[in-house]
């Protein structure tokens, strides 16, 4: 069975992600990282899910069994783990989170000593070790060679300083009213602290994690509460994080949820004006709206498109010497400050842009009007290779002929196919989506 998906290992806690699997995966990772070890220390963090305690304990057992020392830092955002792994000179970092998924799911993702997500070749090597009984048995240490673990509570300050350093020193957030929805997740302490220390009037919602309310009708996937609070409190802006705070959703002062591509476009144009956009280009994914292309062209900025997943965005950014990119879903990467999508860094850049431009959020983000786009997640029973589906090429050609951009791809973690259609005529896009849905229902026995 394949372990790694598009973002680490993910599944239902206690089922696919059991204590046994977690411990063995940690042992396999430990064996791999020992080959290039510099400090013999691995950092482990988690979000606020109840199952995080079980998985954390199993991971610590697995790592110490193969001789690694472990630093446990408790609930912290995913980008904090990436930053602290490098900052604290660890051999690797491990984050226990299923991001925006419900509380009963969990996941394990790894970072190398520089705070980068692992590429697929390394994941494949760890997976190979995971299934090698002899190698795992022989790697287990005894007596004084068994590793030690230490729980540390004071590292949050290092990450807060890093976030504040991404905000222009000549600015402050006095007279700015901000509503934060921390999704009962990993940002529940750090996000309010950062905004308060910079002088904002901060209102926080969904900040009482109990182990099972993470992402529950709140946060980046459910910004409705945030939108109504921003309006009710006459706030200047609202920010919603997901469970591990690597993505951000923005709500303007009118309570309108800002389109993810409008965030990317506006920030790219702002960086370009500030002469801070390297390479005169940004990276977005194949999911991004064609209106983003047109908006960036008007600002003389080039758009490169990667596969879906922030690690692929980052890969393309590195290959092309680009320092800004992201996904429509709210993963935004400022490579000057972070190695992965970071909701807090993004929120800092958004408020800095508002202050420097002297404009309201709605005025800035209203400049990019996305073309009608429909995304449908269709449950399926089998994942046939797309190039083997009869009639699909003809369907794509007929859509293109009508000026409709199409993208069909399987979810890396669930039995779903994601169907995306985009065009300038809403009615036509809706009509064709009905046909596309029926086509895939028949083709994949959904």
UniProtKB/Swiss-Prot annotation:
Domain of life: Bacteria
Catalytic activity, EC: 5.4.2.10
Single annotated GO MF: phosphoglucosamine mutase activity
A single Gene Ontology CC term: cytosol
UniProt-listed GO biological process terms: carbohydrate metabolic process; peptidoglycan biosynthetic process; UDP-N-acetylglucosamine biosynthetic process
Modified residues (Phosphoserine): 99
UniProt entry tagged with the keyword Magnesium: yes
Function, in words: Catalyzes the conversion of glucosamine-6-phosphate to glucosamine-1-phosphate.
Top-level class of the enzyme under EC nomenclature: isomerase
Modification note: Activated by phosphorylation.
InterPro entries in UniProt: A-D-PHexomutase_a/b/a-I (IPR005844), A-D-PHexomutase_a/b/a-I/II/III (IPR016055), A-D-PHexomutase_a/b/a-II (IPR005845), A-D-PHexomutase_a/b/a-III (IPR005846), A-D-PHexomutase_C (IPR005843), A-D-PHexomutase_C_sf (IPR036900), A-D-PHexomutase_CS (IPR016066), Alpha-D-phosphohexomutase_SF (IPR005841)
Residues annotated for Mg(2+) binding in this entry: 99, 242, 244, 246
Key word Ligase present: no
SUPFAM superfamilies, per the entry: Phosphoglucomutase, C-terminal domain (SSF55957), Phosphoglucomutase, first 3 domains (SSF53738)
Listed name of the protein: Phosphoglucosamine mutase
Catalytic reactions of this protein: alpha-D-glucosamine 1-phosphate = D-glucosamine 6-phosphate
CDD domains per the UniProt record, alphabetical: GlmM (cd05802)
Cofactor remark: Binds 1 Mg(2+) ion per subunit.
Key words of the record: Isomerase, Magnesium, Metal-binding, Phosphoprotein
Organism in which the protein naturally occurs: Campylobacter concisus (strain 13826)
Active-site annotation: 99 (phosphoserine intermediate)
Similarity remark: Belongs to the phosphohexose mutase family.
């Amino acid at each position: 069975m394949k372990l790694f998906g598009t973002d680490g290992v993910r599944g239902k806690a206690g089922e696919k992600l059991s204590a046994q699997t977690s411990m063995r995966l940690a042992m396999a990772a430990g064996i791999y990282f020992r080959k290039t070890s510099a400090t013999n220390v691995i950092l482990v963090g988690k979000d606020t899910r109840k199952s995080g305690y079980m998985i954390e304990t199993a991971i610590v057992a697995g790592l110490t069994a193969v001789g690694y020392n472990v630093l446990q830092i408790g609930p912290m955002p995913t980008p904090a783990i990436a930053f602290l792994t490098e900052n604290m000179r660890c051999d690797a970092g491990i984050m226990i989170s299923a991001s925006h998924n419900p509380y009963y799911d969990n996941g394990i993702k790894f970072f190398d000593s520089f705070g980068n997500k692992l590429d697929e070749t390394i994941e494949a090597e760890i997976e190979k070790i995971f299934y090698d009984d002899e190698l795992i048995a022989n790697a287990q240490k005894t007596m004084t060679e068994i590793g030690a673990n230490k729980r540390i509570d004071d590292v949050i300050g290092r990450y807060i300083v890093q976030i504040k350093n991404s905000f222009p020193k000549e600015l402050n957030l006095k007279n700015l009213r901000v509503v934060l929805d921390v999704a009962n997740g990993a940002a529940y302490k750090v996000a309010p602290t950062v905004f308060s220390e910079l002088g904002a009037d901060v209102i926080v919602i969904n900040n009482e994690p109990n182990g099972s309310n993470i992402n529950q009708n709140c946060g980046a996937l459910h910004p409705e509460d945030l939108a109504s609070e921003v309006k009710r409190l006459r706030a200047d802006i609202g920010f919603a994080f997901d469970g591990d705070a690597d993505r951000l959703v923005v709500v303007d002062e009118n309570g309108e949820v800002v389109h993810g591509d409008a965030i990317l476009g506006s920030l790219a144009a702002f960086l370009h004006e500030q002469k801070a956009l390297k390479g005169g280009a940004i990276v977005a994914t194949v999911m991004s709206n064609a209106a983003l292309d047109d908006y960036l062209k008007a600002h003389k900025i080039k758009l490169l498109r990667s596969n879906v997943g922030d690690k692929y965005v980052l890969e393309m950014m590195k290959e092309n010497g680009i320092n800004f990119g992201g996904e429509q879903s709210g993963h935004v990467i400022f490579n000057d400050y972070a190695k992965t999508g970071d909701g807090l860094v993004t929120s800092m850049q958004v408020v800095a842009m508002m202050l420097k431009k002297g404009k309201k959020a709605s005025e800035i983000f209203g400049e990019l009007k996305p073309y009608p786009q429909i995304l449908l997640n269709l449950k399926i029973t089998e994942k046939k290779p797309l190039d083997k589906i009869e009639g699909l090429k003809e369907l794509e050609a007929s859509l293109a002929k009508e000026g409709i951009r199409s993208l069909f791809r399987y979810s890396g973690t669930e039995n779903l196919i994601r169907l995306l259609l985009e065009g300038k005529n809403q009615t036509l896009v809706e009509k064709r989506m009905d046909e596309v849905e029926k086509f895939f229902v028949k083709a994949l026995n959904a």
